A protein has these predicted regions:
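Acidic, turn-prone loop/beta-hairpin segments
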Residues: 1-20, 47-142, 146-152, 178-180, ...
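Short helix-adjacent coil turns
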Residues: 22-29
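Hydrophobic residues within the alpha-helices of tandem HEAT/HEAT-like
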Residues: 38-39
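A broadly conserved sequence feature marking short terminus-proximal activation segments
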Residues: 140-187
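Processing junctions and N-termini across compartments
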Residues: 183-186, 198-202
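Short cysteine-rich clusters marking metal-coordination/redox-active sites
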Residues: 189-192, 205-208
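Cys/His-rich microdomains that often coordinate metals
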Residues: 196-199, 209-212
Length: 218
């Protein structure tokens, strides 16, 4: 998936920068780079965009599996690079993940191969996300919506609408002449909280219906 490729690209870049800082004995700069990556790009962006997939997709869905694979690489990369700075915390995290016999301080720095991404598209996409978030905040302040999932968005950019929907956390995105945000006029799925034009007979959306059926079959 495009979002996972982008996060692997960013992880590869950040970890490379951190090792460069460590090699120059600028440990405070390495820590700062990791701190900003965790706060801005993981917590405020990737985790926010993908929590819906982790919570609501079928356990074996391709998208959820890809997301978990990226999370594993993020964990290994962050913990090994934080180990010189936070030896006890990273040791505890590593043993919790891999068992009491494992020791992060016996590991080398974990890196990931760089993934090719369309840099111009991502620059435009992140700029659009900022614009959408500003409009969503205005709508929220006016009492129009609560969560972003209550909104639908019309974009004025030539970008993949599903990718825009994912990174903005809204229920529907379409293309138009100008950027517009509004409360979605459809039905709320009580399982994933996204809005749709119609729900299934089970009272939930098609995606959730299929995920529940898969869980019951297992």
């Amino acid at each position: 998936p495009e979002l996972e490729r982008y996060m692997l690209h960013r992880l590869h870049t950040v970890l490379g920068d951190v090792r460069g800082h460590f090699d120059a004995y600028h440990f405070h700069k390495g820590y700062r780079a990791l701190y900003e990556f965790c706060g801005t790009e993981l917590s405020n962006f990737y985790f926010d965009a993908r929590k819906d997939v982790l919570y609501c997709d079928a356990a074996d869905s391709e998208l959820r599996t890809a997301c978990i694979s990226v999370l594993v690489q993020i964990f290994r990369g962050l913990v090994t690079h934080l180990a010189p700075l936070m030896p006890f915390t990273t040791d505890e995290a590593w043993r919790e993940r891999y068992g009491d016999e494992a020791c992060v301080h016996m590991e080398v720095f974990q890196n990931v191969p760089g993934a090719e991404v369309d840099a111009a598209q991502w620059q435009n996409l992140l700029a659009l996300r900022d614009r959408v978030n500003m409009e969503l905040e205005k709508l929220r302040a006016a009492g129009g919506i609560g969560a972003n999932t209550e909104a639908e968005v019309v974009i004025d950019a030539d970008l993949p609408v599903e990718l825009v929907r994912e990174v903005c956390g809204v229920s529907h995105v379409s293309k138009g002449e100008a950027l517009q945000v509004a409360k979605h006029g459809g039905h709320k799925c009580p399982r994933c909280w996204r809005y749709y034009g119609k729900l299934e007979q089970s009272g939930i959306c098609l995606r959730c219906d299929e995920a529940v059926a898969t869980t019951k079959a297992a």
